[in-house]
């Protein structure tokens, strides 16, 4: 009789452990885990076509990871733009980006490192000095592509580096050319996850 009771207790404990483990697995496999975040950083860009155009901005963003793979963010930025010839312009803008977690299937979810692809559209505004009377206020639309590498500092705080490329119509007329403007970009910042 005692053997039967001991066997029954062992089986019940094993079953309870198995059920608990299955609950943990199901919780971790849930593909719909939304997560809000805000971020801030410094963004710089330099023309890739040799036109000596550089830009430095403060950038803030807010977004949502819809699940463990796809997210979106809204960005705003403001800063300064330097053109060849010693001219500069105030710049500000806003954009929308789609984020894709490239590490979801290749790394542990609790990994301290994350790599995401970024694709988006950005609307910009440039306020030029009086030397450019025909284009004192210029609006632009740009496409941007990049990769974001993020490292967890704490459970909620991440540091990220985001290199990328920005493509847009040329927005200034100092040399009469009509080239598309292509710039390499780099953003360094921090993200707070809610």
Stretch-by-stretch model annotation:
Residues 36-38, 56-60, 92-96, 115, ...:
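Hydrophobic, lipid-facing positions within transmembrane beta-strands of outer-membrane proteins
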Residues 47-56, 83-89, 174-180:
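Solvent-exposed loop/turn segments connecting transmembrane beta-strands
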Residues 9-16:
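Bacterial N-terminal signal peptides
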Residues 5, 19-39, 102-115, 194:
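Outer-membrane beta-barrel biogenesis signature
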Residues 21-65, 71, 126:
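Short glycine/proline- and aromatic-enriched beta-strand/turn motifs that initiate or cap beta-hairpins
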Residues 1-7:
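Bacterial N-terminal signal peptides that target proteins for export
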Residues 93-96, 162-169, 175-193:
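Detector for outer-membrane/organellar transmembrane beta-barrel domains
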Residues 64-142, 151-155, 191-192:
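Gram-negative (and chloroplast) outer-membrane scaffold detector with strong preference
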């Amino acid at each position: 009789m005692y053997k039967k009771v001991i066997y029954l207790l062992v089986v019940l404990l094993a079953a309870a452990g198995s059920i608990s483990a299955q609950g943990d697995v199901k919780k971790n496999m849930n593909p719909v885990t939304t997560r809000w975040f805000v971020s801030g950083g410094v963004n710089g860009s330099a023309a890739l076509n040799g036109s000596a155009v550089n830009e430095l901005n403060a950038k803030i963003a807010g977004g949502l990871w819809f699940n463990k793979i796809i997210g979106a963010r809204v960005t705003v930025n403001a800063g300064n733009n330097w053109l060849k010839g010693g001219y500069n312009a105030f710049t500000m803008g806003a954009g929308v980006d789609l984020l894709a977690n490239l590490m979801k299937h290749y790394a542990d979810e609790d990994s301290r490192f994350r790599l995401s692809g970024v694709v988006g559209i950005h609307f910009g505004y440039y306020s030029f000095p009086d030397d450019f009377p025909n284009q004192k206020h210029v609006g632009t639309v740009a496409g941007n592509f990049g990769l974001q590498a993020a490292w967890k500092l704490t459970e909620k705080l991440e540091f990220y580096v985001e290199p990328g490329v920005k493509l847009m119509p040329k927005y200034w007329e100092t040399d009469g050319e009509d080239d598309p403007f292509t710039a390499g970009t780099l953003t360094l910042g921090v993200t707070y996850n809610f």
